[in-house]
C-alpha cells in the first residue's frame, strides 16, 4: 500500500491499464519495445517508464530506494545525495514546464503558417477524463474501447458499455468523442476471447477481423455505441480496414443493429462513422474508401510498422522504427491532400499516435 516502482520481466497492456497511478510511481521492464501499446499507455497515464531495458535487474533491489529517469533511460538504486538533488531538480523543472503549458489553455491551436488545427486527447477509459478536462482538450480523438475488455475477466455487457460511453459523452458536453471499436489482437490479448496462438499476431486475426468473424461481440458493442450517441457528440471509428468490402459488411451489421433497436423502441443517435488508415492497402484504397465513410483517422504507429515492415514489438528494431521516414510521411501526405477524396467541409482527416 506504499508508493512504489514496479520492476518486471514484462507488462502487457492489459496489466498496465490496471495500474494504480496513485501508488505506481514508475515501472521498469526487461522486455518490450518503446513503440508498444504498453509504452503508449505509460505516456497516457503519465507514468515514467523504462521499457526493454538492458540494465541488469535482480531481486536484490527489492525494497530499496530507486529513481527512474525515463527521459535519459536511467535507473538509480540507492542513489547518493548528489544524485538525489539532481533528480529532484529535474523533477522540479519538469513540473514548471507542465505549469507553463497550463497557461496556454483556452488559446487556439494555430500552426506557423496560420492553419488552425484541433488538438484532441486519447483515452483508454473514463478515468482519463479528468486529465482531458484539466488540459482543455478540444475533444477526444481516440477512445481505445478495447481497454474496457482488457480490464476484466469476462465480456462487458451492452449495458455496462453503454453507461461508460454515455458518461464520457455527457462529460465532454458536446465536444467530439471518437470511439474506436474493439481493437484486440497483436500485443493486446484477452484470455477469455480464447484466440488461437499465432506466429505473427500483428498480421493475424485482430481488430475489425475479429469483429467481422465474431459478429455477436461486434453487435453488442455497436448497440451500446448507437444508444450512447443519443447523449452526446459521438463518432464511431473502425480499425484495421483494408478494403471497401469490409466497410460494406460493417454497414450491413450496423443496419441490423439499428433495425433491432428500432423494433425494440430503444432510442439511438446517428453518429458519424469513420475508419483507421493504418496499412499501405488502406492508403492506396483511400479514394474508394472515402466514398463510404465520414472521416479518416491515420494511425501512425501501425502505419509506420506496416510501411517499413518492422515489428513494433521487437525492441531490437527500435532504432529502425522511424515515424518520420520519408515513405511514412508520403503515405500521410497522400491521404490529406485534396485529391484523396475526403477533403471537404463535411469530412475530415485526423492523425494520432
Regions found by a protein language model. Give the residues of each.
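Acidic, glycine-rich flexible loop/linker segments
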Residues: 2-3, 8-135
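Conserved alpha/beta-domain cores
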Residues: 99-353
Amino acid at each position: 500500500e506504499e508508493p512504489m516502482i514496479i520492476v518486471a520481466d514484462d507488462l502487457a497492456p492489459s496489466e498496465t491499464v490496471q495500474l494504480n497511478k496513485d501508488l505506481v510511481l514508475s515501472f521498469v521492464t526487461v522486455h518490450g519495445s518503446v513503440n508498444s501499446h504498453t509504452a503508449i499507455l505509460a505516456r497516457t497515464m503519465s507514468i515514467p517508464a523504462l521499457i526493454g531495458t538492458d540494465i541488469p535487474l535482480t531481486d536484490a533491489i527489492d525494497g530499496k530506494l530507486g529513481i527512474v529517469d525515463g527521459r535519459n533511460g536511467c535507473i538509480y538504486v540507492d542513489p547518493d545525495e548528489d544524485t538525489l538533488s539532481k533528480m529532484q531538480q529535474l523533477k522540479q523543472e519538469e513540473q514548471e514546464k507542465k505549469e507553463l503549458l497550463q497557461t496556454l489553455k483556452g488559446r487556439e491551436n494555430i500552426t506557423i503558417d496560420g492553419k488552425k488545427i484541433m488538438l484532441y486527447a486519447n483515452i483508454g477509459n473514463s478515468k482519463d477524463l479528468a486529465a482531458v478536462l484539466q488540459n482543455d482538450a478540444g475533444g477526444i480523438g481516440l477512445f481505445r474501447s478495447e481497454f474496457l475488455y482488457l480490464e476484466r475477466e469476462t465480456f462487458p455487457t451492452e449495458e455496462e458499455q453503454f453507461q461508460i460511453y454515455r458518461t464520457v459523452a455527457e462529460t465532454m458536453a458536446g465536444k467530439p468523442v471518437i470511439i474506436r471499436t474493439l481493437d484486440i489482437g497483436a500485443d493486446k490479448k484477452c484470455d477469455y476471447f480464447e484466440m488461437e496462438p499465432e506466429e505473427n499476431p500483428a498480421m493475424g486475426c485482430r481488430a475489425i477481423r475479429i469483429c467481422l468473424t465474431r459478429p455477436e461481440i461486434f453487435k453488442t458493442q455497436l448497440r451500446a455505441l448507437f444508444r450512447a450517441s443519443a447523449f452526446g457528440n459521438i463518432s464511431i471509428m473502425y480499425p484495421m480496414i483494408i478494403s471497401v468490402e469490409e466497410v460494406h459488411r460493417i454497414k450491413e451489421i450496423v443496419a441490423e443493429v439499428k433495425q433491432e433497436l428500432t423494433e425494440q423502441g430503444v432510442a439511438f443517435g446517428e453518429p458519424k462513422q469513420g475508419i483507421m488508415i493504418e496499412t499501405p492497402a488502406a492508403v492506396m484504397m483511400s479514394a474508394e474508401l472515402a466514398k463510404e465513410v465520414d472521416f479518416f483517422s491515420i494511425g501512425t504507429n501501425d502505419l509506420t510498422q506496416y510501411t517499413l515492415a518492422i515489428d513494433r514489438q521487437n525492441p531490437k528494431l527500435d532504432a529502425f522504427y522511424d515515424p518520420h521516414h520519408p515513405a511514412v510521411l508520403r503515405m500521410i501526405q497522400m491521404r490529406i491532400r485534396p485529391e484523396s477524396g475526403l477533403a471537404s467541409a463535411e469530412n475530415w482527416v485526423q492523425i494520432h499516435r
